[in-house]
Structures are given as C-alpha cells and as structure tokens.
Amino acid sequence: PYAHQQIARQMEDGTVTKRYCAFVYGSPPHPEGEVNAPIGRLPGHPRLRAVVPDGAPSLTRYAVTTRYGCGACKLSVSLATGRTHQIRVHMQFLGCPLIGDPDYVGDPAVFAPLARELAGVIDRQALHASYLAFRHPVTGERMELTAPLPDDMRRLERELTRLSQSRDM
C-alpha cells in the first residue's frame, strides 16, 4: 500500500515521466509541437472522448521521429495531462489518427488506401508506452524503465519502410 500511494502521488504531482511511440496516418504540421485542446465525452457516445469546448484541459507534446513516404509518421509522444484516450483524441484532432485505431480514425476516405495496404499487419492501435521514469517509493532513487517495440509494431515499422521505398522507385 505505501509504495502504491507514493507512486500514485507522483502521478498526481506530474513528476512521473511517460513517453509513447505512436504510428500515425499523415504528417503533423511541424516536426515538433503540442496539442493544447480540452477533452471531454463525445456527445451520444459514453465511452468515447473528443475535443470539446467545455472539456478538461489537456496537453500532448509530440516529435516526429520518422516520416514515411507512404503517408505515415512515427512519433514520440508525451503527456502533460492524463485524460482518457488523450493521445488518440489529440492525434485525431491534429489530423493524424493512430494507425489501427477503430474509434478515432479521422476521415476514412483520406487514409483508406494506406489502411488497406496495412490490413493484417497490426490489429490494434499503433501506440506503445516506451519509457517511464519515477522516484523509487522507498529509496527515492530515480528509476527509468524502457520497453522495446512489440513484435506487431516492429512489423508495422518494417512495412511502412517497405511501402515508402516501393513508392520511391
């Protein structure tokens, strides 16, 4: 209980650092940026969220790590706030929905051709918690944990590279 309370307190204080790897359709307008847009429930859909005027303040930072010529990007994403579905909602709002996300897909007509080419490569949203840093609840030592991309996301990365190279020819 004590350790859990200490880590929960760090999360509330915003002293836990989390980074995610995301593969998105399209390309953000800038190599680095942030989405500062309030998130709340999507009217008529109790489990979904959206950028809404009366939503909770929400801030997501992103950096493009790879641009694929086939119409996708790999991003490093971090959260200044922790809203439900925040990355998914903010990426859709930015016009770059997560690959494989059935709920926050954006304009299907825009991304349908690439989505068809990626069918069967990944069967979930292409989002992975890759880095976590916090203070050990007992010793106070800074802990940094990293997690490599899972197999399905590495497969996606290879396929995006292959599709991009085939378009360059």
What are these regions (language model features)?
Residues P1-M169:
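RNA pseudouridine synthases
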